[in-house]
Amino acid sequence: MSKTHVYELAKKMGVENKELMARLKSLGIEVKSHLSVLEDEDVQKVTAPPTPPKGVQQQEEVRVTTTVIRRRPKAVAQPPEEVAPAAVESAVIEEAPAPRVEAVPEEPKASPAFAETVPAVEEPKGVEPKIGVPKVETPVASESKAEEPRVTAPPAQPKPVAAEEEKPTMNRARILGRVELPGLTTASKPVPKPAERREVVIPPKRKMEERAVTPQPAAPVADDRKKKAKTFTEPETPAGGAPGAKKGAPGGKKKEAFKKAELLEKRERIFEPGPKTGKGRRRERESVTFGKKTEITVPKAIKRIIKISESITVGELAKRMGVKATDLIRVLMKMGMMATINHPLDVDTATLIAAEFSYEIENVAIDTDEMLESAPDTPESLKKRPPVVTIMGHVDHGKTSLLDAIREANVIAGEAGGITQHIGAYDVELNGRKITFLDTPGHEAFTAMRARGAKVTDIVILVVAADDGVMPQTREAINHSKAAGVPIIIAINKIDKPEAKPERVKQELMEFGLVSEEWGGETIFVEVSAKKRINLPELLEMVLLQADVMDLKANPDKEARGTIVEAKLDRGRGPVATVLVQEGTLKVGDYFVAGVHSGRVRAMQNDRGDKVLAAGPSMPVEVIGFTGVPDAGDVFISLSDEKKAKEIASHRQQKLRETELAKHSKMSLEQLYDKIQKGEVKDLNAIVKADVQGSVEAVSDSLRKLSTDAVRLNVIHSSVGAITETDVNLASASNAIILGFNVRPEPKASAMAEKEGVDVRLYNIIYDAVEDIKKAMEGLLEPTLREKYLGRAEIREVFSVPKVGNVGGCYIQDGKVLRNASVRLLRDNVVVYEGKMSSLRRFKDDVKEVATGYECGIGLENYNDIKVGDIIEAFEIEKIATKL
C-alpha cells in the first residue's frame, strides 16, 4: 500500500498546502501539517470529483425536471406560476441595479444579462464566483433574451424586501443560474447590503446615462469594470429594461425611457441619506478650498512649547521655532555670546532666547536619580557591618608600611619612591571581626581621591611620622576628614627611631583641635611602629572600639550600592574596578551602572585573589564586566533590569558629551576682547597616560593647577593604558607632550614619536612629573637626563641557575643590548622592574653586546621574578640641556 504526503498530493492537484489541508479537514481526514501521510482511501476521497450536498442535488433535480427555463421562451405568462413568486420578484428587482455593477460582454444586448449574473456570482461566496464568471457568459447571454419578455418594471420597487425574504431561494438558484436561469440567479445572489454599498459610492452629480452604467462595486477590479461600463453606456442603459432590448421592437425605447426614470428615482432615494465619498467628495472639497485665501496662522499654545533634554543646538532650536538660525545668532550676540549654528545651548539660555520669539522651553531630561531611588530601610532590616577605615598621611610617613604590617604581607619592597601608586582596598580579620582598609597615596596630587575616600570611609587613621611631625599633606588630610565628619585616630609611626619625638607631634596636632585623651581631649592617639610591629593590635582594637560606638549598620537584603575605589584596564580581563559595597549584596550575574558605564558582574575577586560569589556591606571586591573604565569615586548601583542600566548609562554619556561640548565651545565677546588685548595666549597641551584611573585624574588635576597668566596648561586627553600610536598622532597634531606614569610606549609608538618629534616623558612618581613641568614653566629646569633607547629582548625560556637565580633565555627583537646598560622589565607594557643587568652571555661566554636576531641569556640584578613573555628593554641615560 503506497502512502502519499500532503504536499505531494497538493503539488499534483495544483493547489496550495493550506487549501488542501482545509479540504481534508472538511472531509473528516485529520492532518497535522503538509508532511502528514495520507492513505490511498483518503487520496481517493480527495481526488474524487466533488459532489454537492444532498439537499442541493435534490433542488437541482427538481429545477431541471420542471424545465422552467425552456418554458419561458415559449410562454411568457406561465413560468412565473411554477417558479416561486418571491424569486421572480427578486429577479425583476435585481435587473435594475445589475447594469451598474458590471458590463463585461462584448455584445450590447447580452451585456445587461451578463451584468445581472456577475453580482449574483460575486455576492454569496466572495472570491469563488469570480472564477465562475467567464463560464457563465455565453449561456447567460443567450437565455436571458428568452427570459426578458416576462420582466416588467413595476415589480422592481419592492426590491429590498423581496431580496431579503428570498435568501434560501438565492442559494438554490445559483447553480441553476449558471445553466439556464440567469434571471433567478441574479435575483438570488446579490445581498441587499453590498448592493446598497455599491450604489452609495456612486457620485450623484454625474449624468443619468453614466451613473446608470458606472457603479463602484466592492470587487478589486472596480476600475476596469468602470472603464468597460463607460464604453457600453448606450446598450447598458436599456439593460434595466431588458425586455425591450430583447424584442428589438419599437417599444424598446419606451422601456428604456421608463427604466431611466425608475433608476433616477431609486438613486435619489438611496443617495439622499448616504454620506459623500470618493471622487465626488474630493472634487467638492477642492472646489470649496480653491477659492479660499491663504491665511497666516499662529501656532497653538501647545505647539509653542519646545521640549529639550539638557541642551539643544542653535540650529535645532531655530528649526523647532520655525525661524532662521541667523535671527537666533543675532539675539545671542545682543546677549554678549558668540555662537554658530552648531553651538549648544543649555536650558536657561534656550529659555531666554525662546522668550524673545514667544516660545516656552520645557526640560524633559530623564531624572536618573529618581530612577535609582530605593525604598528606605526599616530598623528591623539593618544588621551590623564591618567598619571602613582610610589611612591618610604625608608622603613617606609609612601609610603602606603600616597597612602591610597589619596584613602581614611585604609588598612595600616594589613600590617606587616610597609612594603608593594607586588606591587599594583590603579586608582584614581580627578576632573574628572584619575591618576594611582603604589605602590612599599621600601625595597632594591625590587630593581628589582622598576626598572621595573620606566620603566612603567610617574612620580615618592619620599616620604621622614621629621624626618628621605635621606636614602640609597632613593638614590636608585633617581638613578632608573634618569636612566629611569622619572621626580621626592618630597613629604616630616610626617610634622605633632614635630621633622620634611623639610628644612634639601631639603638641603640633593640638593646633587642629586634635587633643589626646591623655591630655583631656577626645582624639585617640596610638604610638606604633610598622617596621617593628609595635602596638598594632592596640591600634586595631581602638578601631573596633570606635566602630562599636558608631554602631555601624546596613541592610544586606537589597540591591547592592557602593563606590568605585579604583579602576584599570587589564589586557586579559578588560575593564576591572575595585568596588566597595556599602549596602545590599552584590552577586555574580547582577546588572549594574557606574557613572557613564554599565555592565554585568561576570566575576568577583577579593584582595587575595580568591573568587567570590557574593559581596555584602563593607566588603571590597574586584569586579569584572564593565563596558568601560569607570572613574574612581563613581557610585556603583546594582539593578535587576539590563535595559534600565543601559538606558541610564546612555543618558549619562549623552549628558557628559553635551556638557563637554558646551564647556569647550563657549566664548563671549568679553573673552574674545580680552584675548585680543592680551595677545596670543601660549598654551602647553599635554596627554596623560597612567596605569590606573586614579593616577590619571590626579596627574590631570595637578597639571591644570600649574596654569599661569603666561602659560596655560591644557590636558587634551587622558586615559588608562600604554602609550599608543593614536596618542602620538594626537600629540603631533595638537603640538602636545605625552606624560606617562608607570606605563611604557609601544614599540611602534616610540618609533613614531621619534619620527614626529613628539616629546614623550615617562615617570614613576607623580611628584617628579609635576615638579619637572613646574620648573620648565618657570624656566628653572636643570639639564635633564634623557633616556636613549637601545633595544628590546623577549624572554622565551626561564632557567634556574644555582647560587645565581633565574636567568632569562632571550631573543633580541630589535636594536642591541649592551652589558653595562640599564634595563627595564615589562609585563603587559607595565613596568615591573627597573635596574641593572647582572649578566649577558652567549653560549656560556660573557659578551659586551648582542645584536638583533640573536639569542642570549640575561640576568637581572637582585630580581628573579621573570616569566616567559616578559620584555627586557635596554637603555642608556644621557645628559642633555633642557630647552623650554
Swiss-Prot record:
Record's GO cellular component terms: cytosol
Region (G4): 493-496
Subcellular compartments: Cytoplasm
Gene Ontology molecular functions: GTP binding; GTPase activity; translation initiation factor activity
Parts of the chain that traverse the membrane: none
InterPro entries: EF-G-like_DII, IF2_II, IF2_N, P-loop_NTPase, Small_GTP-bd, T_Tr_GTP-bd_dom, TF_IF2_bacterial-like, TIF_IF2
Principal localisation: cytoplasm
Region (G1): 393-400
Chain segments carrying region G2: 418-422
Biased composition (Basic and acidic residues): 194-212
CDD domains associated with the record: IF2_eIF5B (cd01887), IF2_mtIF2_II (cd03702), mtIF2_IVc (cd03692)
Domain of life: Bacteria
Compositionally skewed regions (Low complexity) per UniProt: 234-248
UniProt-annotated stretches for the region G5: 529-531
Domain tr-type G: 384-553
Region: Disordered, residue numbers: 42-62, 123-254
Keywords, comma-separated and alphabetical: Cytoplasm, GTP-binding, Initiation factor, Nucleotide-binding, Protein biosynthesis
UniProt: GTP binding residues: 393-400, 439-443, 493-496
Record region (G3): 439-442
Function per UniProt: One of the essential components for the initiation of protein synthesis. Protects formylmethionyl-tRNA from spontaneous hydrolysis and promotes its binding to the 30S ribosomal subunits. Also involved in the hydrolysis of GTP during the formation of the 70S ribosomal complex.
Family per record: Belongs to the TRAFAC class translation factor GTPase superfamily. Classic translation factor GTPase family. IF-2 subfamily.
PANTHER family: TR-TYPE G DOMAIN-CONTAINING PROTEIN (PTHR43381:SF5), TRANSLATION INITIATION FACTOR IF-2-RELATED (PTHR43381)
NCBIfam families: IF-2, small_GTP
The protein, known as: Translation initiation factor IF-2
Primary gene name: infB
